[in-house]
Regions:
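N-terminal loops that bind phosphate or other acidic moieties
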Residues: 2-147
Length: 147
């Protein structure tokens, strides 16, 4: 089964996991890592490496991070690069995590989707769920409905 690890600044990873569990129920295959304010980056990196090594079984692993090129992302990449070649090949780091992406990952986890296909769909879901709404758009639609 696809393993999921969420690595973020603050408690965001725990919040994302909690929100997902409200929607789809609990999962024993989602791990979280929180970079706390003032925490030593090297120490955090060691924790990420330990947890990633612990969960990285023969199954593929998705590591979600909140910001690319930030500390959680960099530490995740460093940890992945220390895995065996086989485990490294089965691990993907995805930046810019949001709740739709996590839900999509959980769906693919349950469906046992091949990792390459799952990653493609997860990233698409994350992008497709970005939108902007403003009241002026509603007013315009109301005006157009009059005709």
């Amino acid at each position: 089964m696809l393993e999921i690890m969420i690595v973020t600044h603050g408690k965001l990873s725990e919040g994302l996991k909690d929100a997902a569990e409200v929607i789809v129920g609990t999962s024993s295959h989602i791990e979280t890592m929180c970079l706390e304010s003032g925490e030593d980056i090297q120490t955090f990196g060691e924790k990420v490496k330990e947890k990633l090594t612990m969960i990285n079984t023969a199954e593929p692993v998705l590591v979600f991070v909140d910001l690319i090129s930030a500390s959680p992302y960099n530490q995740a990449l460093l940890a992945v690069n220390e895995l065996t070649e086989e485990k490294k090949a089965a691990t993907y780091v995805i930046g810019g995590v949001n709740l739709p992406m996590l839900l999509e990952a959980i769906n693919h986890q349950m469906l046992h989707t091949p990792i390459e296909e799952a990653v493609e769909q997860i990233v698409k879901q994350g992008k497709d769920n970005l939108t902007v709404w403003h009241a002026s758009a509603e007013e315009k639609n109301l005006d157009e409905d009059d005709f």
